């Protein structure tokens, strides 16, 4: 499969998770937008992705509804793993006409922070850090050399920025700013945008 345009990455730390992605939307080397948000908060969870923007947005909306339905029907919060598995099942249902996206899904529950990687047909892998999209090969090199699960969230943001900036330098389909979603162990979250020139 051809690499999907964009770069998104996530890291799991003892204090929470960080999801991030750059903002350039491009197809076939043509820049369509410099302000495409690829990191979304869904209740207590976060999702980031690379690929077809409409597919990522559709999956985000579907997950928002499915999570609310699950929690209302079962009268309890859904775990990160169960929510990720639900996303995996949705992706697998469309295996013959797949959503063209690679996704990172994460959050914090009673078991602590969790990060999952999903491909277009629903393969589900739990990991400590991951990068997806056309700039993933560059970004993962930075994450592998600098990742430490015990680092604090501020240091984690620095590493995420360093990895995405490295990917932006080498990948023409990535650029124009970075969105960062941080979900802390107490389930509070923050969203930041860093403009890159």
Curated annotation (Swiss-Prot):
Activity regulation summary: The formation of the proteasomal ATPase PAN-20S proteasome complex, via the docking of the C-termini of PAN into the intersubunit pockets in the alpha-rings, triggers opening of the gate for substrate entry. Interconversion between the open-gate and close-gate conformations leads to a dynamic regulation of the 20S proteasome proteolysis activity.
Keyword Cytoplasm: yes
Record-level Gene Ontology MF annotations: threonine-type endopeptidase activity
GO biological processes: proteasomal protein catabolic process
EC numbers on record: 3.4.25.1
Keyword tags: Autocatalytic cleavage, Cytoplasm, Hydrolase, Protease, Proteasome, Threonine protease, Zymogen
Enzymatic reactions: Cleavage of peptide bonds with very broad specificity
UniProt xrefs under NCBIfam families: arc_protsome_B
PANTHER family found in the cross-reference section: ATP-DEPENDENT PROTEASE SUBUNIT HSLV, METALLOPROTEASE TLDD
Family statement drawn from the similarity comment of this UniProt entry: Belongs to the peptidase T1B family.
Subunit structure, as described in the record: The 20S proteasome core is composed of 14 alpha and 14 beta subunits that assemble into four stacked heptameric rings, resulting in a barrel-shaped structure. The two inner rings, each composed of seven catalytic beta subunits, are sandwiched by two outer rings, each composed of seven alpha subunits. The catalytic chamber with the active sites is on the inside of the barrel. Has a gated structure, the ends of the cylinder being occluded by the N-termini of the alpha-subunits. Is capped at one or both ends by the proteasome regulatory ATPase, PAN.
Listed name of the protein: Proteasome subunit beta 1
Record organism: Sulfurisphaera tokodaii (strain DSM 16993 / JCM 10545 / NBRC 100140 / 7) (Sulfolobus tokodaii)
Gene responsible for this protein: psmB1
């Amino acid at each position: 499969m051809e690499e999907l345009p964009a770069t998104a990455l996530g890291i799991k730390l003892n204090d929470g998770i960080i999801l991030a992605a750059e903002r350039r939307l491009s197809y076939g080397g043509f820049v369509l937008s410099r302000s495409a948000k690829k990191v979304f908060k869904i209740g207590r969870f976060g999702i980031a992705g690379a690929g077809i923007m409409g597919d990522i947005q559709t999956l985000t909306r579907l997950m928002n509804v499915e999570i609310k339905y699950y929690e209302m029907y079962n009268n309890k919060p859904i775990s990160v793993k169960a929510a990720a598995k639900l996303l995996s099942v949705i992706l697998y249902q469309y295996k013959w006409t797949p959503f063209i996206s690679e996704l990172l899904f994460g959050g914090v529950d009673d078991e602590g922070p969790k990060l999952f990687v999903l491909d277009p047909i629903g393969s589900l892998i739990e990991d400590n850090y991951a990068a997806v999209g056309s700039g993933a090969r560059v970004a993962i090199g930075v994450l592998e050399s600098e990742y430490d699960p015990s680092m604090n969230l501020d240091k984690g943001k620095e590493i995420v920025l360093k990895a995405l900036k490295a990917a932006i330098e080498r990948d023409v389909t990535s650029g124009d700013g970075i969105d960062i979603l941080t979900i802390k162990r107490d389930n509070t979250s923050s969203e930041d945008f860093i403009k890159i020139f």
